[in-house]
Amino acid sequence: MSGLGRLFGRGKKEKGPTPEEAIQKLKETEKILIKKQEFLEQKIEQELQAAKKHGTKNKRAALQALRRKKRLEQQLAQTDGTLSTLEFQREAIENATTNAEVLRTMELAAQGLKKAYQDMDIDKVDELMADITEQQEVAQQISDAISRPVGFGDDVDEDELLEELEELEQEELARELLHVGDEEEEPPVALPSAPSTHLPAEPAPKADEDEAELKQLAEWVS
């Protein structure tokens, strides 16, 4: 029977505990031992006080108290050692459980990675990249062909076009010269129209004024 089997009271043929069950059982046992430690410490303190109480008054009782104290201290030391062993076992199982979980996770990741690349190899990748490059070149050639100007009317005589252009330039030059000649002729001078208002009457001569004054003076004398 293994150490764990003896600890949990299981036979050889019985299935061993899972790591979680073992950890839980160890924690429960640790709690029991901790309570035992507290009890032993209290009993040791009581026996120490009893030995002090009897002292020289009752030497026999004092010695008995010290003997009991000594046995309790031995039990406490054994309990401390057992508790340390259980803590070590529990920590070892916890670490093993953690490592096992990490290992399973890494194994799953490796399987997933293997599955992702199971249909791929370097030759297929090179072939795929070559196909992509070829298709890009074809696409570029098509784009260049589409953007190239189409040569409709390439069979037209170039000299004939130049002659027609020269005729158009001559006609345009003739129109410009005619327009310039019209601008150089002086327009007819427009005469001002006769004024519509009447001119003021001219003042009477100076002689008529004198004659009128003399006539007025003669009339006054008579």
From Swiss-Prot:
This protein's GO CC annotations: cytoplasmic side of plasma membrane; ESCRT III complex; late endosome membrane; multivesicular body
Keyword flag Coiled coil: yes
UniProt-annotated stretches for the region Interaction with phosphoinosides: 1-116
Function field: Probable core component of the endosomal sorting required for transport complex III (ESCRT-III) which is involved in multivesicular bodies (MVBs) formation and sorting of endosomal cargo proteins into MVBs. MVBs contain intraluminal vesicles (ILVs) that are generated by invagination and scission from the limiting membrane of the endosome and mostly are delivered to lysosomes enabling degradation of membrane proteins, such as stimulated growth factor receptors, lysosomal enzymes and lipids. The MVB pathway appears to require the sequential function of ESCRT-O, -I,-II and -III complexes.
Protein name as it appears in the record: Charged multivesicular body protein 4a
Domain notes: The acidic C-terminus and the basic N-termminus are thought to render the protein in a closed, soluble and inactive conformation through an autoinhibitory intramolecular interaction. The open and active conformation, which enables membrane binding and oligomerization, is achieved by interaction with other cellular binding partners, probably including other ESCRT components.
Stretch list, region Intramolecular interaction with N-terminus: 151-222
Family: Belongs to the SNF7 family.
Membrane topology of this protein: Peripheral membrane protein
One GO biological process term: late endosome to vacuole transport via multivesicular body sorting pathway
One Pfam family linked to the record: Snf7
Native source organism of the sequence: Bos taurus (Bovine)
Superkingdom of source: Eukaryota
Chain residue ranges for the region called Disordered: 1-21, 177-222
Subunit field text: Probable core component of the endosomal sorting required for transport complex III (ESCRT-III). ESCRT-III components are thought to multimerize to form a flat lattice on the perimeter membrane of the endosome. Several assembly forms of ESCRT-III may exist that interact and act sequentially. Self-associates; overexpression leads to the assembly of filaments that curve and associate to create circular rings. Interacts with CHMP2A. Interacts with CHMP3; the interaction requires the release of CHMP4A autoinhibition. Interacts with CHMP4B. Interacts with CHMP4C. Interacts with CHMP6.
Residues that span the membrane, as ranges: none
Region (Intramolecular interaction with C-terminus): 1-150
Molecular function per GO: lipid binding
Keyword annotations of the record: Coiled coil, Cytoplasmic vesicle, Endosome, Lipid-binding, Membrane, Phosphoprotein, Protein transport, Transport
Disulfide pattern: none
Protein location: Cytoplasmic vesicle membrane; Late endosome membrane
Coiled coil: 20-105, 155-180
InterPro entries, per the entry: Snf7_fam
Modified residues (Phosphoserine): S196
